[in-house]
């Protein structure tokens, strides 16, 4: 695995997520590969969840705006992507 082998998967950095008309707030499946033990997920620097490595976390984005999504593992490795919600 490359150095710092923890990687967010399924979300591209810079992606724009659009709400479907008057539909429900968009939800993203937050998932990472290469982590050890427990993964800590942060949204704009605030912790939103802890899950065992290999498990996904569902996150709803109720408000439009820019979001920074970060994942960290117990070994101190991390990955980060930025998305926009419209």
Where are these regions (language model features)?
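Soluble, non-transmembrane domains of envelope/secretory-pathway proteins that act on or interact
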Residues: 1-86
